[in-house]
Amino acid sequence: MPDWYAKKTLGTLLDEAAGRWSAREALTFAGQRWSFAQLRTEVDRTARAFIALGMQAGDRVALWMPNRPEWLYTFFALAKIGAVVVPINTRFRTSDLAYVLWQSDATTLMTVDRSGPVDYLAMVHEICPSLASSRPGHLHVEQFPQLRHVVILGAHPGAGAHHWD
């Protein structure tokens, strides 16, 4: 029996929206505007960067950042490559973050350096002290054996993390 609806992924939906309404506004943030075509371009660029890091379908990627365009780029890019988004509440602190990373078996953590008074980077260093002496992509934290990558949006993240650029 044929399906009565077409099965689509979130990544496919973005591609279709960009094809149908390429010039229409898809996203606004802090006075900036992105059309569907521009959003798709950013998402595809982000997906290619993730693939270059070695991310693949099934990888769990913890996303711990406030609302901003990069959150959306990341979400759709991960959907396109088949990775699993592990959203983390931005009100969580060190012990909560550690629990989510451990429970989810995340291979990658994506976050910001800081947002307002909250220093996310300091909390990452607190639970992953080896980050400062690691090479990007070669993180080894006993508590989080699957975690290999930390990607930081904002200030220079230090030796062991990738910088979002």
Could you say what each language-model-derived stretch is?
Residues M1-W4, G137-L139:
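Short, P/G- and charge-enriched loop/turn segments at secondary-structure junctions
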